[in-house]
């Protein structure tokens, strides 16, 4: 019996396709739910506890950070506000949101009222004196505007203090529909600055602005005239200070009297405001330090042969100040009588730096084209004081040690140096010839030498900077193999205690 062949798959109907799609959607939603539950379980059981634990651990760090933040703010006199408020209260409450929305509505309402004053028909407000301050008509009659200028000028400070009485947006009886509550204190400035001005006052404001521009131009031209007058004057800035200050004060008084004449109204108030905002240029000359580029000479001294000296900077010309020559007779006449007495002490010589202060006499004694000059410099350096604590560059005010070459001339000092070197060299050679290995063996073992640790101060070396630097250079030359260049210097390294040149002397 033969098996039937596979039949062709029949096409699904629309109902079956819809059911299949619904099953797939249901399975997908179930998978999404299971995944969401799994993620929620992971977040709540693993992540959130770790975050809370991290917050608890970092609380102390945040407290310390706030302390240092306040400390640096107080030390630098700076306030860094904003971050701490966001951290402490990051979520705004609904009440705060509504308050913020109300503030925005108030500012927009004030702006709309200043731009289009015809949309509102407020009832007339009465001030403390019982007079109408402002009366605005409806859309049909915008031209009839009554504005008490003198009252407004006098009651302007009262409006700042009692803003509730004179506010256009005030609606105590509920006459205005869609009115907003009072604006915060920061809205007062906006309303007062953008208060609707009547049509008649626009020309006055324009005139005041033109007057302020004219005053500014007058100040500028007067400044330019004053500076040119200063440069025209041959004596520079030294003459006419008091007269110019008096003229400036008189001009200020005349301007104040001219601006304050007439009735007291908005023109005078606005003119005073515009004048106060302008830079006070006419007071700048009072604080100018009049220092000439060339002292004790005017500008005319720059080019005496030319006719005009205006605009010439004295710095661009080379001026060589010449001091008047004083004759010897004049100095003798000006000298007081007590200086001529023989008992007066001579004037101390000015301090002079020793040219050979840092020259080593041992290095300068060998070779070179100017050997004699070097020897003289070395003799000067040796003649310097060797007291510790006394600087080499300062003059010898009071010498504590005996100056060996004080009364000897330069040639005798040089001769003494050469003789001392030759004697030291001969003595060293004789000592080295006497010491031999045979004599050391004959004497046997040398007895132990007792070292005295309490060294008296007289045995300590007195090494100023010059001698110490010379010893360091000699040691470096010995290490580098330049022992031939150093003759007459000590063969032993320097130590704290003075060394005996006589090696055979066993005394400490």
UniProtKB/Swiss-Prot annotation:
Keyword Cell cycle among UniProt keywords: yes
UniProt keyword terms in alphabetical order: Cell cycle, Cell division, Centromere, Chromosome, Chromosome partition, Cytoplasm, Cytoskeleton, Kinetochore, Microtubule, Mitosis, Nucleus
Stretches with biased composition (Acidic residues): 201-213, 239-258
Single GO biological process annotation from the record: mitotic sister chromatid biorientation
InterPro entries membership: DASH_Ask1 (IPR013964)
Location of this chain's protein in the cell: Chromosome, Centromere, Kinetochore; Cytoplasm, Cytoskeleton, Spindle; Nucleus
One GO CC term on file: mitotic spindle pole body
Pfam families associated with the record: DASH_Ask1
Basic and acidic residues bias: start-end ranges: 161-175, 229-238, 326-338
Biased composition (Polar residues): 116-138
Source domain of life: Eukaryota
Keyword Cell cycle applies: yes
Region of interest: Disordered: 86-138, 150-355
Subunit structure: Component of the DASH complex consisting of ASK1, DAD1, DAD2, DAD3, DAD4, DAM1, DUO1, HSK3, SPC19 and SPC34, with a stoichiometry of one copy of each subunit per complex. Multiple DASH complexes oligomerize to form a ring that encircles spindle microtubules and organizes the rod-like NDC80 complexes of the outer kinetochore. On cytoplasmic microtubules, DASH complexes appear to form patches instead of rings.
Function: Component of the DASH complex that connects microtubules with kinetochores and couples microtubule depolymerisation to chromosome movement; it is involved in retrieving kinetochores to the spindle poles before their re-orientation on the spindle in early mitosis and allows microtubule depolymerization to pull chromosomes apart and resist detachment during anaphase.
Family to which the UniProt record says this protein belongs: Belongs to the DASH complex ASK1 family.
Protein name: DASH complex subunit ASK1
């Amino acid at each position: 019996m033969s098996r039937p062949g596979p039949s062709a798959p029949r096409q699904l109907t629309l109902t079956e396709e819809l059911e299949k799609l619904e099953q797939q959607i249901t399975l997908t939603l179930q998978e999404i739910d299971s995944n969401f539950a799994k993620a929620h379980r992971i977040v709540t059981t693993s992540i959130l506890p770790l975050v809370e634990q991290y917050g608890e651990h970092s609380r102390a760090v945040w407290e310390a950070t706030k302390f240092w933040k306040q400390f640096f703010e107080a030390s630098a006199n700076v306030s860094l506000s904003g971050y701490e408020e966001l951290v402490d209260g990051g979520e705004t409450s609904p009440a705060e949101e509504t308050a913020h929305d109300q503030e925005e509505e108030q500012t927009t309402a004030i702006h709309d009222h200043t731009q289009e004053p015809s949309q509102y028909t407020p009832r007339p407000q009465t001030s403390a004196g019982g007079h109408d301050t402002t009366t605005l008509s409806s859309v049909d009659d915008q031209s009839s505007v009554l504005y008490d200028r003198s009252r407004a000028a006098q009651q302007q400070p009262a409006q700042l203090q009692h803003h509730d009485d004179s506010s256009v947006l005030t609606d105590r009886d509920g006459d205005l529909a869609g009115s907003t509550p009072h604006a915060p204190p920061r809205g007062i400035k906006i309303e007062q600055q953008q208060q609707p001005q009547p049509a008649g006052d626009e020309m006055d404001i324009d005139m005041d602005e033109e007057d302020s521009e004219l005053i500014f131009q007058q100040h500028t031209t007067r400044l330019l005239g004053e500076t040119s007058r200063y440069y025209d004057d041959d004596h520079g800035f030294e003459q006419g200070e008091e007269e110019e200050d008096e003229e400036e004060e008189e001009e200020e008084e005349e301007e104040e009297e001219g601006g304050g004449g007439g009735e007291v109204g908005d023109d005078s108030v606005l003119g005073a405001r515009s004048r106060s905002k302008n830079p006070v240029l006419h007071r700048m000359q009072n604080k100018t330090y009049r220092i000439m580029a060339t002292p004790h000479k005017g500008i005319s001294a720059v080019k005496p042969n030319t006719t005009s000296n205006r605009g010439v900077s004295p710095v661009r010309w080379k001026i060589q100040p010449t001091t008047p020559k004083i004759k010897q007779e004049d100095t003798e006449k000006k000298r007081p009588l007590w200086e001529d007495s023989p008992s007066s002490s001579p004037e101390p010589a000015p301090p002079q730096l020793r040219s050979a202060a840092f020259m080593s006499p041992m290095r300068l004694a060998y070779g070179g084209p100017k050997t004699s000059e070097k020897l003289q410099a070395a003799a000067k350096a040796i003649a310097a004081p060797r007291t510790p604590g006394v600087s080499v560059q300062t003059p010898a005010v009071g010498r504590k040690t005996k100056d060996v070459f004080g009364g000897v001339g330069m040639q005798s000092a040089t001769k003494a140096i050469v003789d001392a070197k030759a004697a030291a060299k001969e003595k060293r050679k004789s000592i080295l010839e006497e010491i031999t290995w045979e004599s050391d063996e004959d004497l046997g073992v040398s007895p132990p030498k007792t070292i005295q640790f309490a060294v008296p101060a007289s045995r300590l070396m007195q090494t100023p900077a010059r001698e110490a630097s010379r010893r360091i250079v000699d040691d470096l030359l010995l290490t580098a193999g330049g022992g031939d260049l150093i003759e007459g210097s000590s063969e032993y390294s320097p130590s704290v205690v003075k060394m005996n040149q006589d090696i055979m002397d066993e005394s400490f």
